[in-house]
Amino acid sequence: YFPDLPDNKGLEGITVNTVNQHVFVVKESQPGLLIELDAECRTILSSRCLSKANGFSHPKVGPDKLDFSGLSYDPRSDSLWIVSDQGRCLFQYDWVQDVVLQRLDLEIGEGKRRLVRKAEGVAIDPECGRVYVVSDRDARLYVFKLAAVG
């Protein structure tokens, strides 16, 4: 899953499951990969390919172009929020069931809507139902209010 340099399709994001302290990292693409490590980051416990088979798809982005650039653990729903730069969207993913629960396009602006460009990081505040997404291209932090988390 990790071809020789100068591939630049390596690990992009990291988060911690606050219930069991397991660490998750996401590989950007070719293939997109989610890796679960023990709390000490010494042992790979499991890994999953992120593909159309488990719901990682976007109607405007081909499967070979969809990438993953950040992730955040949500303890309320025991799920992971994974952001895609190329998809300009956010996936809520259930690790146990190995399925995407929902895909949210990262729309911003008043009036004419546009999408966040080059989304590279995500953090969730489950208490407030907010998701924070950082744009590398615009050097901005966007805040999204979720109608229902989980």
Give, region by region, the residue ranges found by the protein language model:
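Sequence/structural signature of beta-propeller domains
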Residues: 1-150
